[in-house]
Amino acid sequence: MVSFTLRAIGACLIGLPALITAAPTSHVSNGFHVVEQLNGVPQGWVQEGSPAPSTQMKFKLALVQGKTAEFEQRVMDISNPKHADYGKFMSREELDAFLQPSSQVKDSVFNWLASEGISKRSVKSNTDWLTFTTSIATAEKLFNTRFYTFKNTADGSQIIRTLKYSVAASAAPYVQMVQPTTKFSAPRPELSSVFTSDLEMTSSANVDCNVTITPDCIRELYKMGNTFATKDPRNRLGISGYLEQYARLDDFSTFIDMFVPSLKGTTFDFKSIDGAKNEQNSSLDSVEASLDVDYAIGLSGALSTYYGTAGRGKLIPDLDQPNITENNNEPYIEQLFYLLDLPDSELPAVLSTSYGENEQSVPPTYSSVVCSLFGRLGARGVSVIFSSGDTGVGSACQSNDGKNTTKFNPIFPAACPFVTSVGGTRQINPEVAIHFSSGGFSERFARPWYQELDVRYYLGHELEKGKWDGLYNPHGRGFPDVAAQSYKFATRDHGKTIGVSGTSASAPLFAGVVSILNSIRLAHNKPRMGFLNPWLYTIGRSGFTDIVHGGSDGCTGTDMYSHLPTPYVPGASWNATKGWDPVTGLGTPNFEKLSKLVLI
């Protein structure tokens, strides 16, 4: 497991392992170490039989990192405006060299693989990842397990998986994760919480910003004036596309003509990851993609790229996604491998992603690996921004470990310490927290040093003593970090102007703001901002408007996605309060102030 030994202010190091739930077992038997084991066949699948022993499978093996603490400290130093190394980002080559496992680690794993007939020459090595293809018969001996064919009860599709896998005791200290093994996944329509309604409008003229949000509303509310980013390749704005969502150029062009005519002619590049298509005439829903490009680019004007990633990610079913065909988990690793392999000159400076899922629905090893990879982007100077989610304190409100414990549900990757999580607000004069804005405290990641004082103050002074005890982890990473408008954004999709709500709107909005701030820094010969959070919680905090009205809700007794009965928690909520809170974070951006603070 990746260990987030993030330094607490005035305190000792805080380690991750004690805060991880449902971690892989450490049981050792017959010379093998059990890496991961499921409680049973995931909902939505039935075991059909056994694959032919000669069937070939490709496996990815993540090696344990020997420099985890040193790397995390390096990322924090690079990102801390009070440190001498602030802004001294690592190059691709420096990062690879820093994270390269020792010869002992690789040799031990290579020797184990070779003992089962997998030669070193047949294994592709990429820093701390190994990729190899072998037969089912060999894999079963290698991982001391049995692979089976599982059938999806909804669509009849079949996959080969196991419910438990192990590695030889000699290699166990060096192996973090192997996939595909225990991870079940299948396509389903996107799950992002965007609530749509048709709008009759052709421009921003005479818009009531309390009713409908347009780029002009955002610019006025957040004091952005007419400032845009310059089209600088050092400040590329990246937008993540998953789940067969396609950003349509004709809709985007119309949106710009209607709402930001000064950017007429602005467009974006498309990059395909893992064979993702660029369907410009698809009849499938593309609301999420449209919203993201409309506001990230429409507010910033930055040189932009839409990164489309094919496929689906890994899922442990829970009440929000009880059937594997309802899988919304995104293939983050595929995107991260692609980005981290890019030359420094081609990396985006900002990456906006408006997707997420319950933290517990992602296997612990998977979330740990992915979060660490986001940290690697931060080390290379990328600001990674995620929406906080649209389920308030939680929707399923129940653990999926077989115990069915009533609990609030934090969101991943929003609760990863290496991303900037954006919650939601609505209204103007005053701006208030919106009820669906997800927030809370991670069950897996320790509270990082940069927010220690803020979160500790909230828990000790703003939250009623004993309130929600047992429903959340008071030692976990608190999220969101900041907030922005998230209700009824005018956007274009499939030739119509519609209203869209969700923190899916907050993230690209904030990404657009950060892109302009980067442009200001670059114009003054300063490095771009990179991983934002250490700056946000120190110098940047005075550039945000504290939101003290409104709050989130959740745990209503009915799951908002599956509509299954769930635990009911009367009055479940995080309230917006003075200072940081787990619904709006530090508050909403005041660009006028931020544009000065970034030059300090």
UniProtKB/Swiss-Prot annotation:
Propeptide: 23-202
Record localization: Secreted, Extracellular space
EC id: 3.4.14.10
Residue ranges of domain Peptidase S53 in the record: 212-600
Catalytic activity line of the entry: Release of an N-terminal tripeptide from a polypeptide
GO BP of this protein: proteolysis
Residues the entry annotates as binding Ca(2+): 546-547, 579, 581
Major place of residence: secreted
Disulfide-bond pairs as recorded: none
The keyword Glycoprotein is assigned to this record: yes
Function per UniProt: Secreted tripeptidyl-peptidase which degrades proteins at acidic pHs and is involved in virulence.
Protein name per its UniProtKB record: Probable tripeptidyl-peptidase SED4
Natural source organism: Trichophyton verrucosum (strain HKI 0517)
